[in-house]
């Protein structure tokens, strides 16, 4: 039986094909699934340069604005780009701050936005808030690498 992070149920064996971006996400999944065994399949963490990451995320924002009624699913963003939900919450708040969009509704699962347009991504790249977000991105990548390289018995405690 295959399930996604939307519908985690108890199971005997849990297999990760995409690694969680942070310990919090891993712990939530383990708590809900309560597996007897955990397998981490071979995985290459998504590591993008800043411009590529923002370009991809911006494309996701535009898609949501034009095709999803402005609804941005945070779990979907996190899963697709391999970063924590908090990264995307902070990015959307920053995009609003620089005038790219207006957030009309928000909760832990999704944001609904009114897209204004993106004229210059350097407004984001040169922001001190983006530097903090980038540090979070680096932490996500380091956590995913730790799942590949470290003793999993220690990580899973």
Enumerate the language-model features and the residues they cover.
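Conserved segment of the helicase C-terminal RecA-like domain
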Residues: 30-51
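A short, well-structured beta->alpha microelement
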Residues: 1-10
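Short amphipathic alpha-helical interface segments
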Residues: 52-72, 76-79
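A short, conserved structural fragment
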Residues: 96-109
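C-terminal accessory/interaction regions of large nucleic acid-associated machines
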Residues: 78-80, 87, 104
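Short, amphipathic alpha-helical interaction segments positioned at domain boundaries
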Residues: 116-156
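Short amphipathic alpha-helical interaction segments
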Residues: 82-97
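A short beta-strand element within the Helicase C-terminal
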Residues: 10-16
